[in-house]
Amino acid sequence: MGNLTYDFSGQTAIITGAARGIGLEIGRFFAEAGADTVLIDFDENELDIASDQVGAKGIAADVSNTESVDKAIADVMATTGRVDILVNNAGILRDKVLWKISDEDWDAVLGVHAGGTFRLTRACVPHFRQQEFGRVINVTSYTGLHGNTGQANYATAKAGIIGFTKTAAKELARFGVTVNAISPNAETRMVSSIPPDKLAEIAAGIPMGRFAHPSEMAAAIGFLASREAGYITGAVLPVDGGLSM
């Protein structure tokens, strides 16, 4: 995928959940646009492959663990000396109807999605404030706005990320930091775990008749990370082919 629009040379971009799918494509986007790109993921084997593919630095970390996150950001600072762009994309699924969701499944999903978004952002804020510049883009979901059967934990986590995005945007604006979110329905491994009949039903309800490609998510994130988007903050951008209309 070529990038003819943005130049992120001299900036460091961190992407979580970056070993595959949307995260990998986002990493590729920033690397091709000249950023010092850091991929963070829990899966070390896939992370090594992804890092080699896009020419980025890979850091294995558990976004649901504060010590692991803080160590990862310290590693980034030791390597590049700055943090400019943070894309919170890490996520997992533990889909069940709510009366079958265990405490463990509930805590795991919220810990990665909402907890990871919080921990990474918190760890980067001191560096954003010192630089008087920063871009945070959180990946939420159509489900966070509208709910979905069998995804009470996921919907709650994604809705929480929307609230976090708007609150962080208000708190960080005076430091030159923007905080936004995208709401995608991308074609990734997480989507492919949905039963085919349910997937076809969802696709039929999308005005554009298909799921997004991860590169389309990356392009939207690239815009929100750019200096051209410097006056946009607290926004939740649907990138879903009109599904949320």
Regions found by a protein language model. Give the residues of each.
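Canonical Rossmann dinucleotide-binding motif of NAD(H)/NADP(H)-dependent dehydrogenases/reductases
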Residues: 6-37
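The beta1-alpha1 cofactor-binding region of Rossmann-like NAD(H)/NADP(H)-dependent oxidoreductases
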Residues: 44-45, 61-71, 103, 215
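Substrate-binding pocket helix/loop in short-chain dehydrogenase/reductase
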Residues: 97-98, 105-107, 202
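C-terminal substrate-recognition "lid" of short-chain dehydrogenase/reductases
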Residues: 118, 133, 210-239, 244
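Active-site helix of classical SDR
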Residues: 121, 157, 165
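Residue(s) in the substrate-gating loop at a strand-loop-helix junction
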Residues: 141
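Short, small/polar-rich loop/turn modules that mediate ligand/substrate recognition or access, typified
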Residues: 173, 178, 232-234
